[in-house]
């Protein structure tokens, strides 16, 4: 085992609901310790600005461009991440000097893998200056430069977790990690540590957009709205018949690849119920492209907290002879897993270890990635 490094991971996902922070100790291969984690919610006004940023980003041709509000938005987003790091350190009585590196995802505002273009807002140099900690950021670009889709990146961390769980006899291969965030993705861990990963379809994004447009709330907490509705089979099938699910070549998704239904298509409750079903069914339908039928689906991300999604997923998986377990049943943290992954990837980046593989993003060969922003020297801060 190499030198153990203390890392903080920061994740602001496609749901745009806030910043997840997690601490991890690792040598870039073995997970030595999963530390504390926390979430810092964005206020409604800032969430609205982020959504405006998505519109501004549509005109980007080169990834360095920041048209419209994006330059100011990137600056504020970075400062909010710095505040989250400082608050997390204070809350957990951790000295910044004891943290070796921060893994900074930033906020994705554009992802066009067919054009080798991905844009995450986030100023790594500013974050390093504000926190006094080295920062690894921009971890998707090198994958795209080598022919990859730029996503998903979390499979390297899933593989490390699977190794830990299988060593303890808690899972048996083949197993699949399911992350239900704004977009859902699958990581298949097969026999002999084979890794295959890809986006599986819409996660929470469509439900969030639907209830925000029709009820003025950011998400369907606890699936309460969906639980009052019925699945509209024709509407569900209009999503599940999308060419994405039948294409032999897997690709990464942007939140704009699937749009919510029109306002007249369903009642609030039926729309939420149908979209919850689509989320679950998309996972099982996409799993048909895996090398083998999974024994276990390990579910993390915000979608695992929606009982309606989980109920449908259980039912559909059982019909395939598989079981579904929430991350917590295996002593994992389903809320902080992506933030933990970004801490893990930051350490791998510093060590020059691969972040992505041909089986995860379609990259031509295993490649590392990320840019390193150094913390200010003592002379600069004196």
UniProtKB/Swiss-Prot annotation:
S-S bonds: none
Entry's EC annotation: 2.7.1.170
Molecular function terms, GO-annotated: ATP binding; kinase activity; phosphotransferase activity, alcohol group as acceptor
Pathway(s) where this gene product acts: Amino-sugar metabolism; 1,6-anhydro-N-acetylmuramate degradation; Cell wall biogenesis; peptidoglycan recycling
Binding annotation for ATP: 13-20
Keywords: ATP-binding, Carbohydrate metabolism, Kinase, Nucleotide-binding, Transferase
Lineage top rank: taxon: Bacteria
Catalysed reaction equations from the record: 1,6-anhydro-N-acetyl-beta-muramate + ATP + H2O = N-acetyl-D-muramate 6-phosphate + ADP + H(+)
Pfam families reported for this sequence: AnmK
Stored InterPro entries: Anhydro_N_Ac-Mur_kinase (IPR005338), ATPase_NBD (IPR043129)
Gene Ontology biological process terms, A to Z: 1,6-anhydro-N-acetyl-beta-muramic acid catabolic process; amino sugar metabolic process; peptidoglycan turnover
Family label: Belongs to the anhydro-N-acetylmuramic acid kinase family.
Known function: Catalyzes the specific phosphorylation of 1,6-anhydro-N-acetylmuramic acid (anhMurNAc) with the simultaneous cleavage of the 1,6-anhydro ring, generating MurNAc-6-P. Is required for the utilization of anhMurNAc either imported from the medium or derived from its own cell wall murein, and thus plays a role in cell wall recycling.
Protein name in UniProt: Anhydro-N-acetylmuramic acid kinase
Organism: Sinorhizobium medicae (strain WSM419) (Ensifer medicae)
Gene name of this polypeptide: anmK
């Amino acid at each position: 085992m190499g030198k153990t490094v203390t890392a903080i991971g920061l994740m602001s996902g496609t749901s745009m609901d806030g910043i997840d922070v997690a601490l991890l100790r690792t040598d870039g291969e073995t997970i030595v310790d999963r530390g504390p984690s926390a979430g810092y919610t964005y206020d409604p006004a800032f969430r609205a600005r982020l959504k405006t940023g998505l519109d501004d980003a549509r005109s980007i041709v080169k990834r360095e461009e920041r048209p419209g509000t994006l330059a100011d938005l990137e600056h504020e987003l970075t400062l909010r991440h710095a505040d989250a790091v400082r608050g997390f350190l204070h809350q957990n009585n951790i000295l910044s000097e004891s943290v070796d590196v921060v893994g900074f995802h930033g906020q994705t505002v554009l992802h066009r893998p067919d054009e080798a273009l991905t844009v995450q807002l986030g100023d790594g140099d500013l974050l390093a200056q504000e926190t006094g900690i080295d920062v690894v950021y921009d971890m998707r670009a090198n994958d795209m430069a080598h022919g990859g889709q730029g996503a998903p990146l979390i499979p390297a961390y899933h593989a490390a977790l699977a190794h830990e769980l299988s060593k303890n006899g808690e899972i048996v291969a083949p197993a699949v990690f399911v992350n239900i965030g704004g977009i859902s993705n699958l990581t298949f861990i097969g026999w002999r540590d084979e890794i295959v990963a890809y986006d599986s379809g819409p996660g929470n994004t469509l439900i969030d957009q639907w209830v925000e447009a029709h009820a003025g709330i950011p998400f369907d907490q606890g699936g309460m709205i969906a639980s009052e509705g019925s699945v509209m089979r024709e509407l569900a099938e209009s999503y599940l018949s999308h060419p994405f699910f039948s294409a032999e070549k897997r690709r990464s998704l942007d939140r704009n690849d699937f749009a919510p239904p029109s306002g007249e298509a369903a009642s609030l409750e039926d729309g939420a119920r149908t979209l919850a079903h689509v989320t679950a069914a998309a996972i099982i339908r996409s799993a048909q492209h895996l090398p083998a039928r999974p024994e276990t689906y390990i579910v993390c991300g915000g979608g695992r907290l929606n009982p309606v999604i989980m109920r449908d997923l259980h039912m559909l998986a059982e019909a395939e002879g598989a079981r579904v377990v929430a991350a917590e049943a295996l002593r994992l943290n389903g809320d902080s897993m992506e933030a933990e992954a970004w801490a893990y990837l930051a350490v791998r980046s510093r060590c020059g270890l691969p972040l992505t593989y041909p089986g995860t993003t379609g990259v031509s060969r295993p490649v590392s990635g990320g840019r390193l922003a150094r913390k200010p020297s003592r002379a600069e801060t004196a």
